[in-house]
Design a protein with these regions (language model features):
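Active-site hotspot residues in diverse enzymes, especially metal/ion-binding acidic/histidine motifs
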Residues: 1-166
Length: 166
């Protein structure tokens, strides 16, 4: 493979892998991380720290706060995967640590981009529609809880994704 092909593969491979994992819901983000050769560790951390992504001699790794609710852990993992996809060049030895109030060493626009991609990973439009149809639901605020349960996401994350009040 020549240099250009390697660069193109580095850019597009993660998106191809994401789409493969989005064939069914809820999206298996742990398997997605494994497919991308990212190790995942759940750790007992303070409540104000959600997760982190870093790189060491063995490759990329993500740490997720095991004290948070499962749906929050799933979003955090998707968010850190999004950092891998979008900001690999910024992930150094110190990694990127995400807290509720502070995002370390990375700009707010980059955090918003990671949040947006995390939502797209967990709740792509085609899966939203399919989950609604298969569960006999309309995509509206009255059905947020049922649809969030089907997708294994928080009601708040789903409401933001749909642009409706939570």
């Amino acid at each position: 493979m020549n240099d250009t092909a390697v660069k193109v593969d580095k850019i597009f491979r993660p998106f191809t892998v994401i789409r493969e994992r989005q064939r069914s819901y809820p999206v298996d983000v742990d398997a997605l991380a494994a497919d991308l050769d990212i190790s995942v560790v759940r750790k007992d951390w303070p409540d104000n720290v959600s997760g982190a992504i870093g790189k060491d001699g063995r490759g990329y790794f993500i740490i997720v706060n095991s004290n948070h609710p499962k749906v929050h852990q799933r979003f955090t993992l998707a968010h850190e995967i999004a950092h891998y996809v979008l900001h690999r060049d910024q992930i150094g030895k110190d990694g990127i640590k995400d807290t509720w109030m502070y995002r370390s060493k990375i700009s707010d626009p980059d955090e918003r981009a990671a949040n947006k991609l995390a939502a797209e990973i967990l709740m792509p439009a085609d899966l939203l529609g399919r989950a609604a149809v298969e569960n006999g639901l309309q995509l509206n605020e009255r059905n947020l809880d049922a649809l969030a349960t089907a997708l294994d996401v928080s009601t708040t994350a789903l409401a933001i994704r749909l642009g409706v009040p939570a």
